[in-house]
Regions:
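Compositionally biased terminal segments of proteins
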Residues: 1-174
Length: 174
């Protein structure tokens, strides 16, 4: 395992520890979320991404900064916050729960993004032998499949196409 990956794993453990101590639940998504659902590290990652409920946005930012992260003013505050911690980039994005059990990001550019019930559950993934909270397979698959059709979406990159194939295989095995 290279130094960058070790730093990202350390950051994942630290963010989870700090937010859980503050009563804030987070879920990995993106490449690290997929790796957690697969149960092993499959590739290098450019950053670490977490979802959390919008009502915890300010509290999460405050406890992460207090613990040593630096918040960056690079994203609309109603949507997400980007950080660095010991030179490792990461972000928190925000969702809201809907009455039907699904989830959305109703504020800002991604208001047409919808995630199915169960996207943010209690079943952990695994990274480097450690259980970690991760967005569900069905949630990540919905997220990836919808992206090109969103109002502000973009075409899939090759890594998105590869991720969708893996997520479909994982979903079929559930």
């Amino acid at each position: 395992m290279d130094e960058r990956t070790e730093g990202q794993l350390r950051l994942i453990r630290e963010v989870i520890s700090v937010t859980q101590a503050a009563g804030v639940s987070v879920w990995l998504f993106g490449g690290w979320g997929l790796d957690a659902r697969i149960g092993r590290i499959t590739r290098e990652h450019g950053d670490v991404e977490f979802w959390l409920e919008f009502m915890h946005a300010e509290r999460s930012k405050a406890v992460l900064v207090e613990a040593g992260a630096t918040a960056l003013a690079t994203q609309p505050p109603a949507e997400a916050c980007e950080f660095t911690w010991d030179h490792v980039p990461f972000s928190t994005a925000y969702f809201d729960r809907r009455p039907d059990g699904s989830f959305s990001q109703p504020r800002g550019r991604w208001s047409d993004w919808l995630f199915p019930p169960g996207s943010f559950g209690d079943e952990p993934g695994t990274l480097d032998g450690t259980p970690v909270p991760a967005m569900s397979v069905s949630g990540m698959l919905a997220m990836k499949e919808q992206f090109p059709r969103l109002r502000n979406g973009r075409p899939w990159r090759q890594k998105d196409i590869n991720d969708i194939e893996i997520l479909r295989e994982l979903a079929a095995a559930l």
